[in-house]
Structure formats: structure tokens, C-alpha cells
Amino acid sequence: MRTISTLDQDDAARAVDAVKAALASEGRAAVVAVADVHGDLLMLLRLDGAPATSITIATNKAWTAATQGVATRAIGARLRSEAEAFDITYYGDRRACGWGGGLPVMDRAGAVLGAVAVSGLPELEDERFAAIGKAAIEGSLEA
């Protein structure tokens, strides 16, 4: 039998709180999603003023980053690369997302624990705020 490490509700709350505070400090609104190692949603927050369509997008970004173990922007870069001729249908799941803003959360050994995603802002800003949530979790992991 094997044991799989994954994010939990406390981790998700830590990330959501950090992103919410950062967004508030800049007067911004977005949707924050945190997924476990399997890509299943642990927590979702839509701040007042964030687009409703960003709920699905943030959830899909979190699923993609968690299940693939890479930033969603990196997947998007592969999709746009003529050299790779990469297609999103490769993933076999309509939740696969190549827009920036989904980041995997890793333990100190590099194993994926889940993901944090933000949607509702331009791609690079989504990713910047997701990185704040990711750092809030990774900074609390045991050595």
C-alpha cells in the first residue's frame, strides 16, 4: 500500500486567505481555487466583482496544474508552439486549461500536493496572485 500526500482544508484556507489579502490590498477582484493532488476542488472563493465565468476557469486551472504537475501557462506555451504541434485534446478531459494562473504546489522533495489557481484578471496577474497562495502553503510545509 502507498501513501499519497495531498493538500487539505487548512492548506487551502491558508492559500485563499493570502490571495484574498493580496487582491484586497490592490483593490482587485478575482476567483481563487485550490485543488488537491487529484485535481478535486478543496476551496473556492469568488471575490465581489469577479466575473462569474472565472469560477469555471479557476477550477479548471487548478485541476490542470494539480493533475499535470506544471503551471498552466507552460501548457499554454506548448499549445501555441508550432514546433510541438501540441493539442489540448491530448489531455482527454475538457477541464484541461492552458491559460496562465494555475500553479502546482509541491512538497520539499518535488512531489505534487495540489494546486492554487486564480482567474478574473489578465493571465500574468492571475499567475502572480496564484504564486502568493502557493507560497503561503509551501512556506508552511514541514521540513
Label the predicted regions.
Residues 1-143:
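Flexible, solvent-exposed loop/hinge segments and secondary-structure transition points
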